Every structure is written in C-alpha cells, then in structure tokens.
Curated annotation (Swiss-Prot):
Name assigned to this protein: Histidinol-phosphate aminotransferase
Domain of life of the native organism: Bacteria
Single GO MF annotation: histidinol-phosphate transaminase activity
Organism of derivation: Pseudomonas savastanoi pv. phaseolicola (strain 1448A / Race 6)
Cofactor dependence: pyridoxal 5'-phosphate
Keyword Isomerase listed: no
NADP found in the keyword field: no
Length: 350
C-alpha cells in the first residue's frame, strides 16, 4: 500500500479479466469473443471516418448510434444510453441507481464485476443462491432491496431465464430498479427490451462485443425509461463526456443496420454450439443448457483445473473459475469448427 493512495483503494478487489495471450498460435476459447468478424459495412464505415476530422472531438451524445439502436429496438432515443463497453455502462448504473440503504440483490453465480462495483461504490449487497440446476428462482428476489441485477443468459453458466420469470421479478419490486444484463441474449433468448415501456423500473444492458463481433471497439448500451437514462447521463457527464470515439459511433451504427450479417454470424455460432455440445457429451462431459456463445461443462472423472492446465499445454485456452459451486466446470467459448477440432483433439490426448 502506497502512502499516496486514498484509504479505500487498499480494500478494493479488482476484476480479473480473461487472459489475452500475446502468442497468436494459441486456440483462444476463454473470453467469449465472436469467432466471425464484424459486419463489412461496419468496417467500411470506420474506414470512411478516417479523415482529418479525427482532430475534432466526437459527438458527446453519439446521436448516430443512439438513433440506430432506438430504430432497431423500436424505442425513443431518450430511452437509450451508450458507454465505452457495457462494463462502463454497468459501472454508471451501480453509481447512479444502486446506492441506497437496503442491499442490492444478484445471483451467487453471476458476472464477477458486480461485487467489484459494489466495493468501489460502497454498496451493500446480498448474493442469492441459484438452484441446483443453476437457475434463478424468481420468488427469491421478492424481498426488500436497493435494486436487482442479473445476467440473462447467466454468465458464466449460459443458463437462460424465461421472459415470464424476468417479468415476475420486475413486478415484485416496483420501487427498485431491476437491471437485466443481456450481454449474450442474441444467442438464444428473448430480450427484455420489449418490456421497458411497461415497467419504468426496468433497465436492460447489452454489448456490441459478442453478437456484433466488435469487442475491440468497446461499445455498450442500456435501454429503459427516460428517467433512468437521465440519471446515467448525469453520471456520465460528470465523469467523461466523450466515452465513444468517432469509430465506435459510425461502426456501431453500421453494425445495427447490417441485419443480414448479424443473423448469419449468430446462426453459425448457435449451430457450432449445438454441435460442440454433442461432441463433448460423447466424451463424457456434462454440459449445462446454454443460450450464450459459450458452454459450461464438467467431466465426472477429471478435475476441471487440471483439464484447463493440460489443454493450455496443448495450446488451447479455456476459462476455469475457482468459485466453490462451479470449480469443477470449464467455460468454453464457441469458436470456429477448426478451433473446436483442436479442443477435441486436446481432450482426446488427455
């Protein structure tokens, strides 16, 4: 601890991101990136924006992208918030909407950034246990709270909560903000954005990193009632008025407009996921139902940490979590057929 630190910094437990190896020959199945490239129209839009205008600040409101998102989801632009990746959007949500006297509620197995944000902003929280099938029990959230947040599909399990159960949670807490974190929704679920006009306490977050193949661009969004969006804008403009650069604005807008590319790559990921599930089950793995671009699997005869280490020795990287309830699972990102073949060959050697 440095004498120059603010006192609270020594108590922070930072988020640990998935490994980004420098060696390109590795088969990288650990951070849920899309194996297929972004929309060619998005790439062309960004190339066209490489002009002398880069000397100018970008639009602080990102109106081009904001209107593209609003048109896509059939909402008003003042119902859309944009940030530098969904992690920044989530950080602003925790700061703007969850600092109350009661405890914030979220699942015991969920996105590990949630407790990090709570520590950063001094938010009390309670983790609600998933059931034995790693599913949310909606009735467990019908209790006093400072807000509710959960990933759907779940990260890291990939399990999907049906929209009827999502709505049950929202209805039970009309005086609290309910955030549905939909980073992976496009790979097998129905978005809760269809509910935002009915529930002023609902906020839905998404990212362009997964189904739009733009993880390197850092674009996240939230959709909800304009009152919630205003709170986020106030926090954003007290922190960084220009979170999205010119490339993100034009590239993100073009990605939303290119529905054909989106549908094509999404369908390829889903087909590859189902094929990999069958192949892993054929090798004795137990695989949880997944609505995401990854699967969560365990083998009854092999320790998960040891499997991950041995796969790495063979040039294949997957994600292992040390958390007690899931310590025997591996999270495996959906890749190309060639990457899956390398994974399966590595497992055969083990």
């Amino acid at each position: 601890m440095s004498k120059f630190w603010s006192p609270f910094v020594s108590g922070l437990v930072p988020y640990v991101p998935g490994e980004q190896p420098k060696l390109t020959r590795l088969v990288k199945l650990n951070t849920n990136e899309n194996p297929y490239g972004p929309s060619p129209k998005a790439v062309e839009a960004m190339r066209a924006a490489l002009t002398d205008d880069l000397r100018l600040y970008p639009d602080p409101n990102s109106d081009l992208l904001k209107h593209a998102v609003a048109d896509y989801y059939k909402v008003q632009p003042n119902q859309v918030f944009l940030g530098n990746g969904s992690d920044e959007v989530l950080a602003h949500i925790f700061h703007a909407l969850f600092q109350h006297d009661a405890s914030l509620l979220f699942p015991d197995i969920s996105y590990s950034f949630y407790p990090v944000y709570c520590g950063l902003y001094g938010i009390d929280y309670e983790m609600i246990a998933l059931d034995d099938q790693f599913q949310i029990r909606a009735e467990d959230y019908a209790k006093p709270n400072a807000g509710i947040i959960f990933p759907n599909p779940n990260a890291p399990t990939g399990c999907l909560l049906g929209l009827d159960k999502v709505e049950q949670i929202i209805k039970a807490s009309p005086d609290s903000v309910v955030v549905v974190d939909e980073a992976y929704i496009d790979f097998g679920g129905e978005t809760a954005i269809t509910l935002v006009d009915r529930y002023p306490n609902l906020l839905v977050t998404q990212t362009l990193s997964k189904s739009r193949s733009l993880a390197g661009l850092r674009v996240g969004l939230a959709v909800g009632h304009s009152d919630l969006i205003e709170a986020l804008e106030r926090v954003k403009n007290s922190f960084n008025s220009y979170p999205l650069d010119r490339m993100a604005n034009v590239g993100g807008a073009a990605a939303f407009e290119d529905r054909e590319h989106f549908e094509s790559t999404r369908n390829k990921v889903i087909e590859s996921r189902e094929a990999l599930v069958e192949q892993l089950q054929g090798k004795g793995f137990e695989v949880l139902p997944s609505a995401a671009n990854f699967i969560f699997a365990r083998h009854p005869q092999h320790d998960a940490a040891a499997l991950a280490a041995k796969l790495r020795e063979q040039g294949v990287i997957v994600r292992h979590f040390k958390q007690q309830r899931i310590a025997q699972f591996l999270r495996i990102s959906i890749g190309t057929p060639e990457q899956h073949q390398a994974l399966l060959e590595g497992l055969s050697d083990i």
